[in-house]
Amino acid sequence: MVGKGKPLLHRRSTLKLSTNLVVDSLQDVANPAKVIEDLGFESLYISERKHDPFMQLAVAATATDRIKLGPEIALAFPRNPMVLAYSSWDLQQATNGRFVLGLGTQVKAHNERRFGLKWESPGPKLREYILAIRAIWDCFQNGSELNFHGEFFNFNLMTPMFNPGPLAVGPPPIFVGAVNPWNCRMSGEVADGFHCHGFHTARTLRENVINNIEDGLQESGRSRSDFTITAPVMAV
C-alpha cells in the first residue's frame, strides 16, 4: 500500500510504471492525473471510451508537469491523418514534449456499425496511416514538401498559412495497440512503441508480440533499445 503523498517509485528506479485513467466526466480528469503524477508514475494513458481521449488529455496536460500522456489507444480510421496530425502536434506543444500518440484499428463491428466506415485492409491501412502522419509532421518540423501518395491516403497541399511550424521538442512518438502477428511486425517497422492487449500470457507476449516486433525492428534497421513495449497487468 502506498501512503498518501509518498512516491510509488524511487526517482532512480529503472522500472517504469504507467496507468490508465477511465472517467465518466471531463471534470474527473485533472485531480486524478495530478495524483498519478505525484505518485511517481512515468506515463498516464487514457482509453477512447465515452469521451474524446484528446480532450481528456488536454485537461490532464494542464494539471501535470512531468508525466507522459497519451491515448491508449485512439481509433485511427474515424479520424483523417491530417486532422490527427494537427491534434497531436498541439498536444505535443502543450505538454512540452510529453505526448505519446497511441493508435489502433478497433474491430470491424465498431468501424462499420458505430462509425459508419468501410472496413478495408486494416493492417496495411494503419501502416500507411502512420507513414502519412510522419510525412505531415516532417512538413511541419522541417519544412519539407508534403507529397505523400498511398493506396488509402494522399496529401500534397500545405501552405504557410496552415503549417504550425516546428516544435523545439520535436514530433511525438507513435505507439500501436494491436493483437495479430502482422500488426505486431508492422509496429516494429514503422512505430516507436507498442501497447499490448490487456489479456495475455507470457507465452503470447513472447511468441505473438515480441518475436514479431523484433522481426519488424530488424526490417527497419533498428534494435530493441529503440522501441518501447507496454504490457498491462490486472490485479484481482
What spans do the regions from the language model cover?
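N-terminal beta1-alpha1-beta2 module of alpha/beta enzyme domains
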Residues: 2-71, 77, 172
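Internal, glycine-rich beta/alpha segment that forms the wall or movable "lid"
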Residues: 12-15, 88, 92-193, 200-227
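Conserved beta-strand positions in the central sheet of alpha/beta enzyme cores
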Residues: 45, 68, 100-102, 195
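Short secondary-structure boundary/hinge segments and terminal tails
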Residues: 54-55, 78-79, 109-110, 205
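Glycine-rich "substrate-gating" loop/helix at the edge of Rossmann-like oxidoreductase active sites
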Residues: 74-79, 118
